């Protein structure tokens, strides 16, 4: 019986010495090992001794070590680290707006880049649920009782994130019929209160939008021109539709045109906007809404391209926050069904109530699509405003009044 067929023949391998030219080209081993000389090393820089030893299994402390509790802890610690980074980026953006540095258009690129970074982190956090979902409901049940009364609702950083972005306090769903801050004590409660009193990203963006060039009544007066164009075009379509022979299609078309007139009538009614604002159905001031719509219509103009990217990224943040809440709801429902949460809430029922427009901060930006019209209805830029929007300057005088300039 023969041995291994692959060894039936002896193979001889010869390795020729690298030529002098090849030796010169092989630079992969020519570096210096600086770590051997002492100084800061990787583990010390990241303080990995603290991070990697911060996983304390409650089940193990109780003498019943459950394997999947380790995954549960690491996943939530990862969430909290990313929340910290989001807050770091968010605070820097708010500072740029607050200090007036946004007047320099070069800083707008910085703002857009950091807001986009927040979006990318949130996208990662949404996808991270898939790792936690490798744990079955029974796996979670094995150690769930060890967690009480700890609860995800007690995440200070997530509540700070909501406040700093601009989730309205009056629209929050009560937690067990109590104010959300009642679940935090001492310094954490004070931090939350302070975050409610600070300028929010929503408020800062609102003030910025109110300074959009072209809204001035004594200047281009975009809003007035848009109103005239829209109602003139709708009236022309209405009259043209009336001349057509009677039919079911004609009646439907007339009814649709009438709805359009009512829709745009509400848009140009400032008192109605203020009423919706008081009810929490709108977030931006009337003037800021005008600015946002103008940026959308003229987004191809050089001066509005970066602002349009910012508005798009703000909507992306809202979208991803909603997806995060929804994925969280689905996971909780899968893991505990209709049981109460470990912190005492109604669990799935409470979380489901937070997946709504109540928690959307930039909902007005989403609703702008309601008011899109054919391009030829949009007021044409006169030479003066066109030249102004065509050139982006280092110091942007368009986003602050002459009284503010120095």
Curated annotation (Swiss-Prot):
Protein name, please?
Tryptophan 2,3-dioxygenase
Q: How does it assemble?
A: Homotetramer. Dimer of dimers.
Pathway(s) it belongs to: Amino-acid degradation; L-tryptophan degradation via kynurenine pathway; L-kynurenine from L-tryptophan: step 1/2
List the SUPFAM superfamilies hit by this protein, alphabetically: Indolic compounds 2,3-dioxygenase-like (SSF140959)
The entry marks the following residues as binding heme, namely 328
Entry's EC annotation: 1.13.11.11
Name of a matching Pfam family: Trp_dioxygenase
The cofactor remark states:
Binds 1 heme group per subunit.
On whether Heme is a keyword of this UniProt record, the answer is yes
- Mention one GO molecular function: heme binding
The record lists the catalysed reaction(s) as: L-tryptophan + O2 = N-formyl-L-kynurenine
Source organism (scientific name): Xenopus laevis
Q: What does this protein do?
A: Heme-dependent dioxygenase that catalyzes the oxidative cleavage of the L-tryptophan (L-Trp) pyrrole ring and converts L-tryptophan to N-formyl-L-kynurenine. Catalyzes the oxidative cleavage of the indole moiety.
Q: Which InterPro entries match?
A: Trp/Indoleamine_2_3_dOase-like (IPR037217), Trp_2_3_dOase (IPR004981)
Binding of substrate occurs at 72-76, 144, 342
Q: What keyword terms does UniProt attach to this protein?
A: Dioxygenase, Heme, Iron, Metal-binding, Oxidoreductase, Tryptophan catabolism
Cofactor(s) in the UniProt record: heme
A single GO BP: protein homotetramerization
EC class of the enzyme, as a word: oxidoreductase
Q: Which family does it belong to?
A: Belongs to the tryptophan 2,3-dioxygenase family.
């Amino acid at each position: 019986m023969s041995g291994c067929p692959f060894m039936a023949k002896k193979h001889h391998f010869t390795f020729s010495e690298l030529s002098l030219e090849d030796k010169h080209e092989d630079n992969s081993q020519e570096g210096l090992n600086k770590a051997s000389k002492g100084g800061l090393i990787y583990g010390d820089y990241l303080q990995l001794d603290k991070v990697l030893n911060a996983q304390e299994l409650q089940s193990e402390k109780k003498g019943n070590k459950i394997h999947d509790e380790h995954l549960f802890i690491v996943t939530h610690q990862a969430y909290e680290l990313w929340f910290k980074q989001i807050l770091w980026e968010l605070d820097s953006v708010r500072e740029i707006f607050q200090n007036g540095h946004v007047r320099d258009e070069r800083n707008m690129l910085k703002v857009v880049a950091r807001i986009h970074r927040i979006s990318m982190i949130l996208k990662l956090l949404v996808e991270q649920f898939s790792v936690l979902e490798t744990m079955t409901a029974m796996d979670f049940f094995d150690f769930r009782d060890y967690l009480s009364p700890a609860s995800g609702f007690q995440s200070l950083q997530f509540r700070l994130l909501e406040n700093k972005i601009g989730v309205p306090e009056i629209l929050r769903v009560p937690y067990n019929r109590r104010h959300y801050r009642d679940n935090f004590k001492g310094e954490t409660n004070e931090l939350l209160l302070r975050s409610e009193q600070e300028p929010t990203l929503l408020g800062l963006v609102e003030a910025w939008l109110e300074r959009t060039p072209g809204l001035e009544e004594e200047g281009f007066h975009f809003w007035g021109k848009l109103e005239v164009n829209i109602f003139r075009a709708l009236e022309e379509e209405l009259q043209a539709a009336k001349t057509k022979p009677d039919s079911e299609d004609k009646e439907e078309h007339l009814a649709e045109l009438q709805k359009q007139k009512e829709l745009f009538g509400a848009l140009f009614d400032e008192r109605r906007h203020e009423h919706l604002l008081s009810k929490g159905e709108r977030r931006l001031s009337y003037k800021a809404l005008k600015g946002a719509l103008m940026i959308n219509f003229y987004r191809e103009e050089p001066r509005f391209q970066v602002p349009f990217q910012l508005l798009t990224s703000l909507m992306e943040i809202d979208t991803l926050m909603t997806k995060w809440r929804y994925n969280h709801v689905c996971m909780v429902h899968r893991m505990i069904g209709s049981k109460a949460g470990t912190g005492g809430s109604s669990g799935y029922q409470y979380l489901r109530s937070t997946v709504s427009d109540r928690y959307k901060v930039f909902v007005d930006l989403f609703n702008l699509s309601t008011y899109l019209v054919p391009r030829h209805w949009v007021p044409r830029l006169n030479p003066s405003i066109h030249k102004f929007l065509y050139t982006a300057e280092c110091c942007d005088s368009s986003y602050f009044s002459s009284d503010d300039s120095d």
